[in-house]
Amino acid sequence: MKKKREEPSAYQRALALLVRREHSRKELGRKLKAKGIEREDADTALDKLNKQDFQNDARFAEVLARSRVSAGYGPIRIRAELGTHCLAREDVDAAMEAIKTDWAETAHELISRKYGNKDLSDQAIRRKATDFLLRRGFDHRIAFAATKLNSHELSE
């Protein structure tokens, strides 16, 4: 006869999630709630994980920010996404400071990759390239500079 398997505790469930990837406290709480775990039990488990440094919102913020930079997103979009995780402002600021990226260079590389040898002196293509960077989370100044820089490179 098979023994009935004991349900994992809130702590065990949260730890199992953290083994796969970093999670914010809010995210873990939401996932535990979805599994039917009481809020009190979830908070106790999350406090314990935080004390043991298995769950750390500052580390989560930095990992997420680095991931988004490598995916080609700009600072506005990254900061907005970090904001959706209910992270402390200090954690978001520290994560943005830690990535130390030259945003103008990143935007320039994205345009070079996406538009290759297309003529960016054509106003319609330049507008599309600028809009692409704006949607990716770069500010207007950087987007305009990157498309202007690329159009000058092609004309030389």
Name the predicted role of every residue range.
Residues M1-E156:
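An alpha-helical, amphipathic repeat domain used for nucleic-acid recognition
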